[in-house]
Amino acid sequence: MSRLGIFGGTFDPIHHGHLIVAEVLKEELQLSRVLFLPAGQPPHKIGRPITPIAHRLAMLQLALQGNPHFAISYVDVRRPGPCYTVDSLTLLRREYSDAELVFLMGEDSLHDLPTWHEPNRIAELALLGVALRPGIEVDLQTIFARVPAARDRVILVPVPLIQIAASDIRRRVAEGRTIRYQVPLVVEEYIARHGLYRTVEAMMPTMTPRTSGV
């Protein structure tokens, strides 16, 4: 059975940090493909300014072109309302019934997993491939105590320390500063061509502490 990676996010915008981590996880976890899962309306970002999905999808498509192992899943953007991870994985489980799903996340997301919506069901639907930055320790036993289904379902993968953040990219654009080499050139050109992230609102972080709505 092949392994299929699921990489969820707002991707506002997609940047080289996302791409490098996805490539490392693909190799280390022996994934046949990585599906990038852009969120239409993340439940933990309601009330925050988010770039329209059409632009985020276009940038994602540009960034992934040329890599046959990277693709986009549209299951979240095609349905209305908040996108819960457990619902997304349920739909993907039906669509890819012949593959083993691996939900890709950072160690910060793993730490917050007990607060997510139906965390045990999430762990039942997919393995959890966790990108572990240098010098970070994860208290797995505490997580397993709160999410029993995650026991034996977590795979920790060391990844390079890449200090690129979408919020910083948006801030730099709003301030008229360069984002060269932080995003693929085609994404940089798209941002400039469409005048994205030039307002004060664009400088606000779209990431908030994860809640039970994730």
From Swiss-Prot:
It is an enzyme of class 2 (transferase). SUPFAM superfamilies: Nucleotidylyl transferase. GO terms for molecular function: ATP binding; nicotinate-nucleotide adenylyltransferase activity. Keywords: ATP-binding, NAD, Nucleotide-binding, Nucleotidyltransferase, Pyridine nucleotide biosynthesis, Transferase. Its EC number is 2.7.7.18. Pathway: Cofactor biosynthesis; NAD(+) biosynthesis; deamido-NAD(+) from nicotinate D-ribonucleotide: step 1/1. It holds the Pfam family CTP_transf_like. It catalyses: nicotinate beta-D-ribonucleotide + ATP + H(+) = deamido-NAD(+) + diphosphate. Gene3D superfamilies: HUPs. One of its GO terms (biological process) is NAD biosynthetic process. The keyword Membrane does not apply. It comes from the Bacteria. Belongs to the NadD family. PANTHER family: NICOTINATE-NUCLEOTIDE ADENYLYLTRANSFERASE-RELATED, PHOSPHOPANTETHEINE ADENYLYLTRANSFERASE. Catalyzes the reversible adenylation of nicotinate mononucleotide (NaMN) to nicotinic acid adenine dinucleotide (NaAD). This is Probable nicotinate-nucleotide adenylyltransferase. It comes from Thermomicrobium roseum (strain ATCC 27502 / DSM 5159 / P-2). The lineage of its organism: Bacteria, Pseudomonadati, Thermomicrobiota, Thermomicrobia, Thermomicrobiales.
